[in-house]
């Protein structure tokens, strides 16, 4: 930015200079700083036009003098300010500025020049679906704001109104954008079934984890992503585990996809055979990119001592089975699910000073998976070992102390169960319910 310090005496050497008009100016938008003190107006503008390469024709403006101090100004803006303050007429034609005395006694600026005070209009927009405060934040933040420097937007939460004050063109652009953004958001219903199931029963449901020969619809992750036998796992999952092995009783992420059309019936049948224990069947309803969660469990109290004032307080830690889902709908109606599954349970008692505290055994899965509308994602990897002891004996004879072993048989059954979460997302249109959607899908099949 250039600086010009012009005094009245400086122009004594410029009075004999003729008026210079350049046919091909370089630019008239270069910004500069200027300070004038009782300077002759015509000679000052003539010298500035010469230094700025601006085409300027000055009419009979008498012997006006001017004092001013302006920062970060360009030549067109300077001419507008002078025309307004000295009641002159400013026009621009074919790249040439014309500055003349005003016959009406008021400063006039031609329509093809920006005025000092822009014309602002006010407009209110009633929102039907979007929240006024959130939409206003989207319109005013960031480098892509549609507001002009003189514009403003306010909102009224009670009536869910946006009040826009800006130049007419900016108001029209903002109204078009609001119309695109104020639309009903698609809802996503998340069906989850949290069960413990044997490995044999899981295979009966059609789940194949693909431990050594992963297929298109089955993936298994144990530890880091780099040590697995398939190459495109990073395109399907976003997982970070600290361990690199999966011993018995540990947690390893397993993801698969199955046809969930008859899943409820099959799980109920397996439950009657005591091969499945259905822990919970939560249903979550949320909107695009909004989190939904459900927890089931208990809170364990802990005594916390404050050494400063020698007081004690009670704090609680959660030991729950929890599911948190954040869906993202793509343009082709595929759904990216951010899943956080936690299985936290009270652990062993640990001596702490003169008291005992209960530890919390934590197992968590945090991953991203893609699913189609209505497709069932299966998450597993939390294992539980159960040992069942039983005794078969002949009545009466099996109770005689000396000979009872001849007429009885003891057996021990070792069973490995896995905590499995079935997650099925459904995209609901406006006014649609999950029950109506499922009936519609079953009718098509």
Curated annotation (Swiss-Prot):
Subcellular locations according to the entry: Cell outer membrane
Keywords: Cell outer membrane, Competence, Membrane, Signal, Transport
Top-level taxon in the UniProt lineage: Bacteria
InterPro entries: GspD/PilQ, NolW-like, NolW-like_sf, Pilus_4_PilQ, T2SS/T3SS_dom, T2SS_GspD_CS, Type_IV_pilus_biogenesis
One annotated GO biological process: establishment of competence for transformation
Signal peptide per UniProt: 1-23
Record's GO cellular component terms: cell outer membrane
Primary site of residence: membrane
NCBIfam families the UniProt entry points to: IV_pilus_PilQ
Family according to the record: Belongs to the bacterial secretin family. PilQ subfamily.
Function: Involved in transformation (genetic competence for DNA uptake).
Name the record gives this protein: Competence protein E
Species in which this protein is naturally found: Haemophilus influenzae (strain ATCC 51907 / DSM 11121 / KW20 / Rd)
Lineage, highest ranks first: Bacteria, Pseudomonadati, Pseudomonadota, Gammaproteobacteria, Pasteurellales
């Amino acid at each position: 930015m250039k600086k010009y310090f012009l005094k009245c005496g400086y122009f004594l050497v410029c009075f004999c200079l003729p008026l210079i008009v350049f046919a091909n100016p370089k630019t008239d938008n270069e910004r500069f700083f200027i300070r004038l003190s009782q300077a002759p107006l015509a000679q000052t503008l003539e010298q500035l036009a010469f230094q700025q390469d601006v085409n300027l024709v000055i009419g009979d403006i008498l012997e006006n003098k001017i004092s001013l101090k302006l920062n970060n100004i360009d030549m067109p803006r300077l001419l507008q300010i002078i025309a307004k303050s000295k009641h002159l007429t400013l026009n621009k034609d074919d790249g040439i500025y014309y500055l003349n005395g005003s016959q009406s006694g008021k400063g006039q600026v031609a329509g093809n020049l920006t005025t000092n005070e822009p014309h602002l209009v006010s407009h209110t927009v009633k929102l039907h679906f979007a929240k006024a405060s959130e939409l206003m934040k989207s319109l005013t933040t960031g480098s892509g704001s549609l507001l002009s420097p003189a514009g403003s937007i306010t909102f009224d939460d009670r009536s869910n109104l946006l009040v826009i004050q800006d130049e007419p063109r900016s108001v029209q652009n903002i109204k078009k954008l609001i119309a695109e953004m104020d639309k009903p958001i698609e809802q996503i219903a998340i069906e989850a079934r949290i069960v413990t199931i044997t490995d044999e029963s899981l295979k009966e449901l059609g789940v194949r984890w693909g431990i050594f020969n992963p297929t298109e619809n089955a993936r298994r992750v144990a530890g880091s992503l780099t040590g697995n036998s398939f190459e495109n796992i990073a395109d399907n999952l976003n997982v970070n585990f600290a361990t690199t092995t999966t011993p018995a009783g540990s947690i390893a992420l397993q993801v698969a996809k199955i046809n969930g059309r008859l899943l409820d019936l099959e799980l109920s049948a397996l439950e009657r055979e005591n091969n499945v224990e259905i822990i919970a069947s939560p249903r979550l309803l949320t909107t695009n990119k909004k989190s939904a969660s459900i927890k089931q469990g208990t809170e364990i109290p802990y005594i916390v001592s404050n050494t400063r004032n020698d007081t004690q307080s009670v704090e609680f830690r959660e030991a729950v089975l929890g599911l948190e889902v954040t869906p993202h709908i793509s343009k082709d109606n595929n759904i990216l699910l951010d899943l956080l599954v936690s299985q936290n349970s009270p652990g062993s008692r640990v001596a702490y000073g003169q008291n005992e505290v209960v530890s919390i055994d934590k197992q968590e899965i945090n991953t991203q998976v893609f699913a189609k509308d209505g497709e069932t994602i299966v998450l597993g990897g939390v294992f539980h070992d159960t040992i069942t002891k039983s005794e078969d004996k002949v009545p009466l004879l099996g109770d005689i102390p000396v000979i009872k072993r001849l007429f009885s048989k003891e057996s021990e059954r070792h069973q490995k169960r896995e905590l499995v979460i079935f997650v099925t997302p459904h995209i609901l249109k406006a006014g649609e319910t999950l029950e109506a959607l499922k009936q519609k899908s079953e009718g098509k099949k």
